[in-house]
Amino acid sequence: MGVDICHKYDRRVRRTKPKSKDVYLELLVKLYRFLTRRTNSKFNKIILKRLFMSKINRPPMAISKIVRFMKKPTREGRVAVIVGTIVDDPRMWTIPKLTVCALRVTDKARSRILKAGGEIITFDQLALRAPTGKNTVLMQGKRTGREANKHFGPAPGVPHSHTKAHVRSKGRQFERARGRRTSKGYKK
């Protein structure tokens, strides 16, 4: 009699290539695969892994956040590297001179960086300039910044839960009666 082995945990779920069929992304993957293999650099390994990621795991990053991170001591003159999109922040009046490398830069952010005397480079240019990631600062946007993330966590209503409930409307009759008002049963 044979033993039925559980193969439930055999497969390690991780991406080995991007889901997207974008030819330019595939070329970048080819380039960083080569660099990861030939240079013993952790930087290239991280870039390659992030190129495989879904759009949700490559959140956009605002100029203001990049500026804040680049203002730290010892980071002057370095290249800010973002495997994702750089977006503009209209709350910031002036931006300093920056050298950034990203997959995408929105039109407004692009014009502001260039107007400040900065430079925007692509990942293939970065590979020539810093094949091992020397003089670069690798950053990423906040992954839990999406509205959907507010609904994740312990059920809304349980003690110490800050999870947002899926409510049809914010009116008086919607989750604002029993347990919320003394006139309706009790108030917690």
Curated annotation (Swiss-Prot):
Compartment(s) of residence: Cytoplasm
Gene Ontology BP, a term: translation
Keyword set, alphabetical order: Cytoplasm, Ribonucleoprotein, Ribosomal protein
Principal localisation: cytoplasm
Disordered: region residues: 147-188
Gene3D superfamilies: 3.100.10.10
Any GO molecular function: RNA binding
Basic residues biased stretches: 161-171, 178-188
GO CC, any one term: cytosolic large ribosomal subunit
SUPFAM superfamilies xrefs: Ribosomal proteins L15p and L18e
UniProt family annotation: Belongs to the eukaryotic ribosomal protein eL18 family.
Name under which the protein is recorded: Large ribosomal subunit protein eL18
Source species of the chain: Diaphorina citri
Organismal lineage: Eukaryota, Metazoa, Ecdysozoa, Arthropoda, Hexapoda
